[in-house]
Amino acid sequence: MSSLPHNHHYETHHRGTAEVPFDELIGVTPDGVPVISNGNEAHFSNLESITAACLPLSSFERKAPCKQPYRKMGVKWQCVEFVRRYLASRKAVWMTSLCTAEEVWREENLFVDVRDGRPVEVVRTPNKSTGPAPAVADIVVWGEGPETPFGHVAIVTEVCASCVRVAEQNQGFEKWPEDVPFSREIAMRTTESGEVELLDEDPLLGWVTVQAPFYNFDDGDLADSFRLVVGQGQILRQPFPKHVDVPWLNTGEECDTILKHSLVVDGNMGEGAHAEEGDVPGAFYFLDYDMFCRLGRAASSLHRIAMAATAKVLEDPESTHLLEHYFGVPPEIQPLLRRSWEMTPPMGGRFDFGYDGKNVVMLEYNCDSSGALLECCNTQEKMARFYGVSQGTSTGSFLGAKCVTYFQRLLTNEKVCPQHRLIHFMIDEDDEERYTARCMMGFAEQAGFRTKLCVKLVNFRYRDGPPSNAAPLATPCDHPTIVDGEDEEVLMVWKTWSWDTVLHQYHSQRSSSDAVNTPTLSDILLNNNIRVLEPLWKAVTGSKAILPFMHALAPDHEHMLAASFLPTREIISRHYISKPVNGRAGQNIMMYDPVTSPTELEGAPQQDICEALSQNASARSLLNGSPLPLSQSVDQTNECSPGKFFDSVLVYQQRLFLKKFDGKYFPIFCGWMVGDEFGGVVVREDTSKITKLSSMVVPARVVRDNVPLGVSYSDEGET
């Protein structure tokens, strides 16, 4: 660090005597926007500040840079860059390019709404005028002067009785103290005639009010895209008293009624209904802004890689072999899978992220599942209201809005959307499937679809002739038309059955000699007239067999563990696990100690699928290799899980040691994807190191403000 000169300008603008180096954090505003050091006022880096969500997380993404609009924030770390980033982060408003900071005062048509590009109006209040006083998020503008040769801009962060506090870049370079979340104070006075004046030795022109509300995170997360991640992030688990009568659930709502029925003892919904204590959450997780953004960007990035890996599998010269032997898709079904890849967009899924106290790492991608949807988008907010937890917002606040948007887009997709706009929601006889389906049906209906709930396979039958309500651009096929009990054509289905289950039933049906006159599960979901959500190609993307392909494309990704079909030297030289590619709910995961035998390490495969793919070679010969038998030592200090979903190939993966909270709990942070967009976070925790179907969903909050995590609470019932 170097000393600052002691002249009038520095003495009035700076608190300390030492500069924070260029590109390092000075402080964070009360509402969560970082201020970064430019080093000194004379420095012009000529380096571009890129919208945070566009920054690549691996070499794979650096090969195909983000091309979305509103990507360039300005020159690092000038005052204009900060104002542009602040407005984008807090209001989803974009400030167009400027030659100098002073132009903010005089140029017209400077601001647009990031969501739709519409102009945003402003009010300019000259200094020492009778206009409105400065308010939080206003832009203070200086003109050209000896110390501000290009003008200057800052953001009002707080208004006090006799001053305003502002945040700014390229004016003041000392680290902010913990209790001083602003750059400086500017004296303010009001004259007897009602004129408001900000007192500063530099030529202060006035303040600009951007007439747009703060961004509503119930509607989406667009504003999060612009937030810089400046630290590893923090997570707090705060215990709360358990209420076994689950009073936050509103039995006047169908979804809540079904959810309560699934929780209470013996399904008793009468007086005294209660759940077992072990079935009710007893805590909230609080995530700071850095952590939430890390999770969201990891999910978005890894989804792109998963899609690219799926394409890689389908394009491989030996794709027929790969699909059959590693993903369980028989050759006769593969044309239907490829058609679904071409026709039907992804709907949703969840990344399971592990956290070791520092790293956030993907464990797997459950993208053929909608479990914990209601709990994420609805229940955890109701719990927050019951407990009086107002800090932050639900980590699923915008999940419902994203689902509605997905269905709205689907409604305009002429390749997919049937003309009668009807979706059949097919589920098994299970409370969780029922309330999840009802929740999703509500989103589809908001978008304009009609819906029907179909429990098991009751009342489906075949009908002669082609469907009359097929999507306008659907390709005719020779598959039979299927109708429901009211003779309405089944042309779009949302399902809870996994594709593993569907394909298993398909194989069983083929090997059976029993005649079947009504449509079976596979007859419906493998019918080329019917578009399915999730589509059949999710049998690839949703399989754990995709993990080695993902790692092959982005081996340096900061949120991914090494994975392979072979016990490679890279994997077995550390703690590692094995798991079946189609295992679910944590079944048959085995944990192993590192292999220490020099002979075994020397004989372990060094090449894996990564090298084959990078050379555009067929992966078949590599995957068919027989690894040397290992003297695998099961990690006796940790847990393994018995059982299998179906017999399948194994994937080997490096192990992450999960952080234990409150000396007992191991959470998994599940990052939702809806379509191709991040949808929020839901947390599942267990006292076991392996998350299972029975693992508790625990409410979570994201705290975007710059405040300590957690709330004060006294157990006095609902507040």
UniProtKB/Swiss-Prot annotation:
Modification note: The N-terminus is blocked.
Site (Transition state stabilizer): R350
Cofactor or coenzyme needed: Mg(2+)
Residues at which Mg(2+) 2 binds: E364, N366
Catalyzed chemical reaction(s): spermidine + glutathione + ATP = glutathionylspermidine + ADP + phosphate + H(+)
InterPro entries xrefs: CHAP_dom, Gsp_Synthetase/Amidase, GSPS_pre-ATP-grasp-like_dom, Papain-like_cys_pep_sf, PreATP-grasp_dom_sf
Family from the record: In the C-terminal section; belongs to the glutathionylspermidine synthase preATP-grasp family.
Described purpose of this protein according to its UniProt entry: Conjugates glutathione (gamma-Glu-Cys-Gly) and spermidine to form glutathionylspermidine in the biosynthesis trypanothione (N(1),N(8)-bis(glutathionyl)spermidine), which is involved in maintaining intracellular thiol redox and in defense against oxidants.
Annotated protein name in UniProt: Glutathionylspermidine synthase
UniProt keywords, alphabetically: ATP-binding, Ligase, Magnesium, Metal-binding, Nucleotide-binding
Transmembrane segments: none
